[in-house]
């Protein structure tokens, strides 16, 4: 029994690919047909690939490993944040800072700075500082939250997989994962290179509903895996 139905995928518009002139020939095996200058993705293959990705993510989660969600394009930002939080995971949805995985010690100093600013706000330090200084500190905090808010509790060594929306846009995240041997699961549209991804989910990465639907399935897999881990304890 599949974790997702063709009907759900159709309703969310997962089958709509890019214009035929903007395609990667390596995606040919996942294309069903062409309609009005747009490639239509073969949803039977998408169902199969979602099942494979779901099982893999569930296993990673069962082992107690974490999954990092990455999606910085506008259509993905909300789903990436909300679904990763629902699954108790980490996310990057604003900007991938170089070294987020490969130079995590430097990133950790920025996270410590963010935590320090939060503490200053909570313990009333901001109330006794000059107004100008507080404005500067608040702006810095806001910027840090945008870029690092989703990974404040992340331990780099415990990341077991990356879930990515649009591997073309998130190529830096994928190359860092590759260096560290971290498997990548991704929503791959008709203009992307599937060879960059370990678990390809062929689908529309530009429609909010399509991204939300697939991202929610990844979150479900994590939750199911964690429950299995709890049952095993």
UniProtKB/Swiss-Prot annotation:
One of its GO terms (biological process) is translation. One of its GO terms (molecular function) is structural constituent of ribosome. Gene3D superfamilies: Glucose-6-phosphate isomerase like protein, domain 1, Helix hairpin bin. GO terms for cellular component: cytosolic small ribosomal subunit. Keywords: Ribonucleoprotein, Ribosomal protein. It comes from the Bacteria. SUPFAM superfamilies: Ribosomal protein S2 (SSF52313). It holds the Pfam family Ribosomal_S2. CDD domains: RPS2. Belongs to the universal ribosomal protein uS2 family. This is Small ribosomal subunit protein uS2. InterPro entries: Ribosomal_uS2, Ribosomal_uS2_bac/mit/plastid, Ribosomal_uS2_CS, Ribosomal_uS2_flav_dom_sf.
């Amino acid at each position: 029994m599949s974790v997702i139905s063709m009907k759900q995928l159709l309703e969310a518009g997962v089958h709509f690919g890019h214009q035929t002139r903007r395609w990667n020939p390596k995606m040919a095996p996942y294309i069903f047909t062409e309609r009005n200058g747009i490639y239509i993705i073969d949803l039977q293959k998408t169902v199969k690939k979602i099942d494979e990705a779901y099982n893999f993510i569930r296993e990673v989660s069962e082992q107690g490993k974490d999954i990092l969600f990455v999606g910085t394009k506008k259509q993905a930002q909300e789903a990436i944040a909300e679904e990763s939080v629902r699954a108790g995971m980490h996310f990057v949805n604003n900007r991938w800072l170089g070294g987020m995985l490969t130079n995590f010690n430097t990133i950790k100093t920025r996270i410590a700075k963010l935590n320090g600013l939060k503490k200053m706000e909570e313990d009333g330090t901001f109330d006794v500082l000059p107004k100008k200084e507080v404005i500067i500190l608040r702006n810095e905090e806001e910027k840090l939250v945008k870029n690092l808010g989703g990974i404040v509790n992340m331990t780099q060594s415990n990341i077991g997989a990356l879930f990515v929306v649009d591997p073309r846009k998130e190529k830096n995240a994928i190359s860092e994962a590759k260096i560290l041997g971290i498997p990548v699961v991704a929503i791959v549209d008709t203009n992307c290179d599937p060879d960059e991804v370990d678990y390809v989910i062929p689908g529309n990465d530009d429609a909010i509903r399509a991204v939300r639907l697939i991202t929610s399935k990844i979150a479900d897999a994590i939750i199911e895996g964690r429950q299995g881990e709890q049952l095993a304890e």
